[in-house]
Structure formats: C-alpha cells, structure tokens
Amino acid sequence: MIINKAMILAAGRGERMRPLTDTCPKPLISVDGAPMIDHILDHLEEIGVKDVVVNTSYLGDMLHEHLEKRASPTIHFSDEDRPLETGGGVVKALPAFGEEPFFVINGDVVWSDQKANCLKELSQSWKKDMQALLLMVPLDKARGYQGDGDYNMNSHGVLRQKEPGEKATYVFSGIQILRPSIFKGLEPGRFSLKAVYDGLEEKGELYGLELKGLWFHVGTPEHLASTREWFEQHKDQHGEKSA
C-alpha cells in the first residue's frame, strides 16, 4: 500500500536543547547542512508523499516562514495555541487524512539510511490489517542513546514494552505509520501517543519494523555536537542519506 500523506510533529519546546531553542524551534536546528525538518521532508518527497501536515506552537511563526518557501511537498499547518503533545496534536490534524493511514514523524528525528530509505521500507511493510507500525532502532544502532530502550519485538513484529527494571532490545525512532481509526472515540486535548500504543499493545496490534541504518539521539547540545561531528566525518560516503 502506498502511504502518500504524513504529519510532522513540530510543536514542542525542546527544553533539553536550551539555550539553542530559546530563539529557534528545535526542528529548524541544522544537522548535515540543513534543518532537521528539511531532511525529513526531503525523504518524504523522495518516496512520493505529496501532502504533509506540520503542527506548530512554540515559535511557530519561524516554522511557517521557513516552510512556506518550499515548493514541495505541499505543507499544511496545524497551529496549536498550546502544545497538545503527540497524541493531541495528531487528533487535531486528523481531518486532513481521511480514512487512509499516514506517516507520523517527530520533527527532530535524525537518521542515516545507508543507501536506503527507511520510510519506503516502512510503507512497503504496511499491511492492510495493521493499525500502527513503528520504526524501531536496535540499541547498538542508536548513537548517543544511553537509556534501556522501549520495546521488545517478536519474530512476527509484535511489540511488547519493557517491564520495569528490564532492558529492552529496541528504542522507538519517532517514525511510524498510523491508521486514523485508532483515534476513534478519543476526545481532543493534550495527551501522548503512548496512550494509544498501550491500547494497541493490549490487543496484540502494535507492530514494529527494524531500522537498518543508524539513528541519532539529539536531545541536548552535546548530543547535537556529536551528531554533527559524525555527519561531517562521513560526508564523503557515497549513498548516505540523512535526516
């Protein structure tokens, strides 16, 4: 199935990236020669996505000014008076997607595909009976990440979140495909997508796909510096695609 619409979550404050985010929304911070959100949009355009919703709140005018200069894909804005978090932001934007599944991507995700496009692979792995498909990163492919992961995944791709004190095999990348119907009955407001994942997990309907490339945890200025250094060192590698 071809996934031809997407949403980029760009309304957050980026507290841990201060002081850089005091004057710039985090998705506009540059990595590998361009703002993080531009790399994401380039990858979406590459696989044929035509329409992208970007939610904004903190320093939203800067995102509008920057993104309105793009010729493609077509950008639609979902402006929030106050940040609605990941789940609430998606619910507010749902009318743009109709009944078809769509990508949801954090606006500060950085990855290196290594001659592939993980968004294309995610789209090709989507099955008509799926409700959610999350791109998962093995801990040894998560640069700068020092946590204990988020989920384990069985041979059928079914995800199970780790138990307290357990170390999981995968960390969630912030990249996914979701079906609009999973939000049916949810009231508009501020809430996290994790509440939706938890409900799907209980029914055995939360699926994952392993990222084949590298993913970079860009949470602080220190992480940003090390990520920029990595891309500078690898800029001459042919076929590298970053976001």
Task: Name every feature range the model reports, one short phrase each.
Residues 58, 133-150:
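Short beta-strand-to-loop element that shapes/binds the nucleotide-sugar donor at the catalytic cleft/hinge
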Residues 13, 24, 59, 212-214:
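A generic "binding-loop/recognition-motif" signal
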Residues 1-8, 34-106, 110-112, 117, ...:
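Conserved N-terminal catalytic core of the sugar/cofactor nucleotidyltransferase
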Residues 23-36:
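Short catalytic helix/loop segments, enriched in acidic residues and glycine
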Residues 1-19, 28:
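N-proximal low-complexity "stem/linker" segments adjacent to membrane-targeting elements
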Residues 101-103, 110, 115-127, 140-143, ...:
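Catalytic-core segments of class I nucleotidyltransferases/pyrophosphorylases
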